[in-house]
Design a protein with these regions (language model features):
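A beta-strand signature from Gram-negative outer-membrane beta-barrel systems
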Residues: 162-163, 207-248, 259-261, 268
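Face-selective signature of the C-terminal outer-membrane beta-barrel domain
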Residues: 307-325, 341-480
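Short acidic/polar hinge/loop motifs at secondary-structure boundaries
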Residues: 74, 146-148, 193-219
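Extracytoplasmic beta-strand/coil segments of soluble accessory domains associated
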Residues: 148-197, 214
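Short, acidic, small-residue-rich periplasmic hinge/interaction motif at the N-terminus
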Residues: 33, 44-52, 86-90, 100-153, ...
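Short, acidic Ser/Thr/Gly-rich low-complexity loop/linker segments typical of extracellular
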Residues: 52-70
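Structural motif
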Residues: 31-41
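Periplasmic-side early beta-strands and strand-to-turn transitions of outer-membrane beta-barrels
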Residues: 244-245, 265-342, 372
Length: 480
């Protein structure tokens, strides 16, 4: 723990020194958003020029927005600049910037207008050339909507199975086996918060509604130091914030499941989005085959987010995820009786802010709960009845602080720390009580604390040569 404390102090010193070591240089930073919905745009290209007559020539420098829609261009001198902002599906915008020396940093809020682009047919022929293979894949909602569907509905995991390096265990299961790792070795994050079991029964479907996703990144191997705790891969999901234009919604009805989504403004600077889905297979079984002994099953899930813009430099949001699965026997009159349930509850507070030195800070406070319970009874109507009950309940309180600083035009420093408190309740009983739902003499309560710090630096030397060097240090302690 002493090493972690020393590491956190060292990180603060490094950030402070790097910020102030820029001397008389100036920084342009800010966020790029959709002017209609207010959603931040990820992967927007920004090119910097000093003369409008030289737009056809290479820029003096350039960058792209990160997963928060944020960009920073450091190491600039006093001058007049023209920033060309481009994003596929949006009109190109030119922003004039005058750096006079009065302020060391200039923070912008750039809004782009959507545009439909129509192109004539283009035929390109040529031999395939060698290229660097990256382990990171960005998947947009537009691409997800075009991928094959199951029962007319896009499923996130089934769509990811079409990507190279991603396998599945069977045609029924959607469990992701990436680069030889099992599904539980994929770090799944929703707005920076861990989801322990992001799938429904047997991985037949993910717990995410594809309509609620704003951006998705899949890292299939060699993930950087900012991610940790898993061995195989990283699935980083960002939920949509909702539109600031007007209230709107969509409803989809299916044979065995239906979904609905609603979004809109909550005020001048706030928006919301809520999406839900319900599978009613057990209801159909009762209606059309009530006497069957086939197991009954249903699930539902809810994704939601509230976004509030405090200022041009500060955004706060609350994200939530809830999913519930229930499998049970059709009748208690049979020789066996079972009831199996599991659920996810995720709630997070996310604060993004930019300080005077264009240092991007991201603070995440999360509550995470995953519970699995099962009750199995044999011959409940006889004297030889036997009932077994077990449950596992994992509750986490989690805090994560990230910092990102582009201290040179080709150098980006990322650092931060994680603090987590785990409470794991394991209960088992051979004499299940219908009233108490537990045996006070059976079970374990395990508590643990976990901490980690990381530091990494991304360098872009040329268009073909880049590096990401960093490290991560862990601390873990359990109390039985």
């Amino acid at each position: 723990m002493k090493a972690l404390s020393a590491g956190i102090i060292l990180i603060i010193v490094i950030l402070n020194n790097v910020s102030y070591s820029q001397g008389d240089s100036y920084i342009i930073s800010g966020f790029v958003k959709d002017i209609v919905t207010g959603e931040v745009l990820v992967g927007t290209n920004l090119l910097l020029y000093t003369d409008t007559l030289k737009f056809s020539e290479p820029p003096i420098t350039g960058t792209a927005t990160n997963k928060f829609g944020y960009f920073a261009i450091p190491s600039l001198s006093i001058n007049k600049y023209f920033l060309v902002v481009r994003h596929i599906g949006y009109k190109t915008k030119i922003v004039e910037i005058n750096i006079t020396g009065k302020h060391q940093s200039e923070t912008l809020s750039i809004e782009l207008q959507p545009e439909n682009i129509e192109l004539k047919e283009v035929v390109v022929e040529g031999k395939r050339t060698g290229q660097a293979i990256t382990s990171t894949i960005d998947v947009s909602p537009e691409l997800l909507a075009k991928l094959p569907t199951l029962s007319g509905e896009v499923d996130l995991f089934r769509s990811l199975e079409l990507l190279p390096g991603v396998n599945k265990s069977s045609d029924i299961s959607n469990g992701l086996y990436i680069r030889g790792g099992s599904p539980d070795q994929t770090l799944t994050l929703v707005d920076g918060t861990i989801v322990y079991n992001p799938a429904h029964l047997g991985n037949i479907a993910s717990t995410f509604n594809s309509n609620a996703i704003s951006d998705l990144k899949l890292i299939k191997g060699a993930f950087p130091a900012e991610y940790g705790g898993r061995l195989s891969s990283v699935l980083d999901i960002k939920l949509r914030s909702g539109t600031k234009e007007r209230e709107k919604g969509i409803v989809g009805l299916g044979i065995i499941n239906s979904y609905a989504e609603f979004e809109g403004p909550m005020g001048e600077n706030s928006t919301y989005m809520v999406s839900g889905r319900y599978m009613y297979y057990d209801v159909l079984q009762k209606k059309f085959n009530g006497s069957s002994n086939i197991p009954r099953y249903n699930f539902y899930d809810i994704n939601g987010k509230v976004n509030y813009i405090l200022s041009e430099k500060s955004i706060i949001s609350i994200s939530g995820l809830y999913s519930n699965d229930h499998a049970y026997s059709p009748s208690k009159e049979t020789d066996s009786d079972y009831d199996i349930q599991w659920k996810n509850v995720n709630l997070s507070l996310n604060w993004i802010q930019v300080n005077k030195k264009s240092l991007l800070l991201n603070s995440i406070l999360s509550f995470i709960n995953y519970k699995f319970s099962s009750k199995i009874g044999l011959s409940p109507n006889t004297i030889n009845s036997y009932t077994y009950f077990s449950s596992s309940n994992l509750t986490d309180l989690y805090f994560r602080q990230n910092a990102e600083l582009k201290w040179q035009q080709n150098q980006t420093l990322k650092t931060g720390f994680d603090l987590a408190y785990h409470n794991y309740d394991l209960l088992y009983s051979d004499a299940y009580d219908e009233v108490l739902e537990k045996d006070p003499f059976a079970g374990k309560d395990i508590k643990s604390t976990e901490a980690a710090i990381y530091l990494q630096n991304e360098s872009q030397f040329t268009a073909q040569l880049s590096s990401n060097i960093g490290g991560r240090l862990y601390y873990w302690k359990a109390a039985l």
